[in-house]
Amino acid sequence: MDALRLAALAEPVTTTGPSPGGMTARVGTLPDLLDRVIGSRLDRVGAAFRWGIGAGHDSASAEAHAAIAIRTARDRGSWLGFATGDPWRDALLADLGVALAALLDDLTPRQAEIAGRVLVDGARQAEVAAALGVSRATVSVAVARGRLPAIASARRAIEALLVGPPPVALGGGEGVAPAARPR
């Protein structure tokens, strides 16, 4: 089975409308890419970007899917789009992308700052509280009200769908690992 290839396109969104065309974002690992996308949305000071993330079995298909993803996001008025070339996965990714975007956009500036430290930087709540000079209870309330566990869940689901089914499900017969099948 070929390794997963990723491509990402980003374009600034201005108050006068989008700036079509975009630029190719450097892609490392999928978790790093999702950190970058989420982090860019949580940065309430910088410019807003629209992202199109494509997955494929080679660089050309990943780049083509990224172009489709950003165009679809632009057409839907969203800042986030995904495409894999698999209609079933793409439909689920579209719905999850809407949910993730809504959750991130609903965060207050303080919740966004805390979300960046927890979800992107991987800091523990106590570390965030110390860094911000607030109580741990304040951070805990922000995590709950900002629905950070739901954001993390949506992110994990998106990551799993972009990667696709595990090889066992593809080659293990009826979706069961060979060792788990009765003999």
Language model regions located:
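DNA-contacting interfaces and partner/effector-binding or oligomerization modules
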Residues: 1-71
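Flexible, glycine/charge-rich interdomain/linker segments that couple
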Residues: 74-98, 102
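Short helix-coil-helix linker/hinge
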Residues: 104-112, 122
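Short alpha-helical "packing" element that flanks the helix-turn-helix/winged-helix DNA-binding module
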Residues: 113-118, 128
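Short alpha-helical "recognition helix" segments of helix-turn-helix
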Residues: 124-132
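Key DNA-contacting residues within the recognition helix of helix-turn-helix
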Residues: 140-141
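Short, Lys/Arg-enriched C-terminal cap helix and immediately downstream tail that follows
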Residues: 147-162
